[in-house]
Swiss-Prot record:
Residues involved in ATP binding: 67-74
Species of origin: Pongo abelii
PANTHER family: ORIGIN RECOGNITION COMPLEX SUBUNIT 4
Single GO biological process annotation from the record: protein polymerization
Subunit annotation: Component of ORC, a complex composed of at least 6 subunits: ORC1, ORC2, ORC3, ORC4, ORC5 and ORC6. ORC is regulated in a cell-cycle dependent manner. It is sequentially assembled at the exit from anaphase of mitosis and disassembled as cells enter S phase. Interacts with DBF4. Interacts with POLQ.
Keyword terms of this UniProt record: ATP-binding, DNA replication, DNA-binding, Methylation, Nucleotide-binding, Nucleus
A GO term for molecular function: ATP hydrolysis activity
Lineage: Eukaryota, Metazoa, Chordata, Craniata, Vertebrata
One Pfam family, short name: AAA_16
Protein name per the record: Origin recognition complex subunit 4
Source organism, top-level taxon: Eukaryota
């Protein structure tokens, strides 16, 4: 009887954990509109009112949301649109068009995407239009039910807005802003960009039709607020089916937020970047360690997740190099120390390596020059070194100037973790100014 009971408990636990994983992953990955906004309530109110004026009163508007990557621009617009669509008279009437500068790389593709999202492919058919403006006006005209007050408002969201400014003649931007200034179909044009100088990219005729409304997001919260965000992002909602499990989970999250080692991890991430995406990545990696046998997150999970986040990819490449390639990197390190970061060539590295070989007076590291050259070229392929300028067909490879893309700290840290690194190689790396 007891074994059956424990089996049932285990199944309940597994089911709870799968729900926890689903809820939190959705929160971390998709920044769903169900998550909370942090420190942008004023901006949210401004944007929400602007959208309501378009949807409810037929007032056309344009606005730019400006902020660094990960500051919450997409999350802000998603929240505002979700709230707007919850209004009964709006949900059936307002149309949304989402464009992205990375996908719609010219105005022709953008216009096709607008037609598709407005479900007007059948209306357009095989019609031939004289200009882009005529085509766009026809699309919006097709949405009208009668006069201006009964027209379908359209919300245009332009992600990576600065990339649209590079389109030929900025035709799309000109026509969208022109419609937002005229008494045609009510539209709201919302641009999302991380460039502060975005207005400098706009042509004079485009700029004159833009309302010059700007909403800035700057991640201005402090560390206490960052810890609060950490708690809110990990906590389970009140409507979670298993109340007992949710209470235990949330108590554990509260305990973690007060743990000194966890606070050190969070402080480190906060100092590097206030970007919530980096926090989500940390939490996602820690969440991956939660299983039926390990149902609650621990400080160790977060510490190990932090180490994965801050892992140096170039140092990891060094761990997989041959001893000869390691020796060449150490030779480059010494050349950088001697010549104060001046570029070097293969011949200089080879000479430095030969000094080491002759000093050790044994044949373990005594490779033929073509073999050393092959190892040098492999380092270039791995992008641990790079040429200072393009090579011409006439130039000799061994005299091409190179630059090392690893600093001394990275090299020494990688050597400490290098499996079975020979003692004399490690000593050579730590010696000052080579063997001079």
């Amino acid at each position: 009887m007891s074994s059956r009971k424990s089996k049932n408990n285990s199944l309940i636990h597994t089911e709870c954990l799968s729900q926890v994983q689903r809820i939190l992953r959705e929160r971390f990955c998709h920044q769903s509109p169900h998550s909370n906004l942090f420190g942008v309530q004023v901006q949210y109110k401004h944007l929400s009112e602007l959208l309501k004026r378009t949807a409810l009163h037929g007032e056309s508007n344009s606005v730019l949301i400006i902020g660094p990557r990960g500051s919450g621009k997409t999350m802000l617009i998603n929240h505002a649109l979700k709230e707007l669509m919850e209004i009964e008279e709006v949900s059936e009437n307002v149309l949304q068009v989402h464009l992205n500068g990375l996908l719609q790389i010219n105005d022709k593709i953008a216009l096709k995407e607008i037609t598709r999202q407005l479900n007007l492919e059948n209306v357009v058919g095989d019609k031939v239009f004289g200009s882009f403006a005529e085509n766009l006006s026809f699309l919006l005209e097709a949405l009208k039910k009668g006069d201006r007050t009964s027209s379908c408002p359209v919300v245009f969201i332009l992600d990576e807005f600065d990339l649209f400014a590079h389109h030929k003649n900025q035709t799309l931007l000109y026509n969208l802003f022109d419609i937002s200034q005229s008494a045609q179909t009510p539209v709201a044009v919302i641009g999302l960009t991380c460039r502060l100088d975005i207005l400098e990219l706009l042509e004079k005729r485009v700029k004159s039709r833009f309302s010059h409304r700007q909403i800035h997001l700057m991640n201005s919260f402090g560390f206490p607020q960052y810890v609060k965000i950490f708690k809110e992002q990990l906590s389970l909602p009140a409507e979670f089916p298993d109340k007992v499990f949710a209470e235990k989970w949330n108590e554990n999250v509260q305990y973690l937020s007060e743990d000194r080692s966890v606070q050190e991890v969070l402080q480190k991430h906060f100092n590097i970047s206030k970007n919530l995406r980096s926090l989500h990545m940390l939490l996602m990696l820690a969440l991956n360690r939660v299983t039926a046998s390990h149902p609650f997150m621990t400080a160790v999970d977060l510490i190990e997740a932090s180490q994965l986040c801050s892992m140096d990819s170039k140092a990891n490449i060094v761990h997989g190099l041959s001893v000869l390639e390691i020796c060449l990197i150490i030779a480059m390190k010494h050349l950088n120390d001697i010549y104060e970061e001046e570029p070097f060539n293969f011949q200089m590295v080879y000479n430095e390596f030969q000094k080491f070989v002759q000093r050790k007076a044994h044949s373990v590291y005594n490779f033929e020059k073509p073999v050393v050259m092959k190892a040098f070229e492999h380092l270039q392929q791995l992008e641990l070194i790079k040429p200072m300028e393009r090579t011409s067909g006439n130039s000799q490879r061994e005299y091409q100037l190179m630059k090392l893309l690893l600093d001394n700290t990275q090299i020494m840290n990688a050597l400490q973790k290098y499996p079975n690194c020979p003692t004399d190689v490690r000593q050579w790396a730590t010696s000052s100014l080579s063997w001079l």
